Amino acid sequence: AFIVPSTTRGRDWSDITETYLFSTLLRSIDSYCPSIPIVIYIGYDSNDPIYSRFEQRQIINALFSKFEIKWIEMKPDPGNVVAVWNKLAEHAIAEGHEYLMVLGDDIIVPKDRDWLKVFIKALKKNNNFGWSAGWSNNDAIATQFLLHKTHIDIFGWIFPPSLRNYFCDDFLNNIYPSKYKNWRKNYHLLN
């Protein structure tokens, strides 16, 4: 499952097709859809100017058929992207997903359709402990991660709820020893 927080608050958009979610992430996944089936869980605030409108969400569901999209409404807590990722992970795991791709809504996925298989294979080699990630214009730390539900089983969340937003990437980069970090810099996940 891909888990993606998204908001249209504070943007000069009037339609869902103007969003980063539509124009960047979903279009790139549609163009270079991974070779394994995926479900994308999108977390949005119940009072979001665009996503809270059912007809707007249905536009996206109608335009993208290569993958399933599930919209998860959240209680508004502006700036707390960590809570959204953690809640989306709960939903995905409850529905039987083992692997969680933690992404932003403005990411372009790799053009290699097997990138997700490569990430999963690397995690399996480590008994699904740690993470796999691509390169996201940051040579110091990874910022978009594939985790197995084992991470949730151990910690109870993807990111510590106290973080809210800043330093959540740093947490995942620092929590695991190097041998459990599968940083595949040849696979670009760019924004």
Show where each model-derived region lies.
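Short, acidic, metal-binding catalytic loop of nucleotide-sugar glycosyltransferases
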Residues: E18-P37
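Short beta-strand/loop segment that forms part of the nucleotide-sugar
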Residues: I36-P49, I72-P76
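A short, glycine-/small-residue-rich helix N-cap motif at loop->alpha-helix starts
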Residues: P76-W85, A89, N165-Y166
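Active-site nucleotide-sugar/metal-binding loop of Leloir-type enzymes
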Residues: N86-Y99
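Short beta-strand-to-loop acidic/aromatic patch adjacent to the donor-nucleotide binding site
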Residues: H97-I108
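Conserved donor-nucleotide/metal-binding helix-loop-beta segment in metal-dependent transferases, i.e.
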Residues: K111-W131
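Short beta-strand-to-loop element that shapes/binds the nucleotide-sugar donor at the catalytic cleft/hinge
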Residues: F129-Q144
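A short, conserved alpha-helix in the catalytic core of glycosyltransferases
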Residues: H151, R164-N182
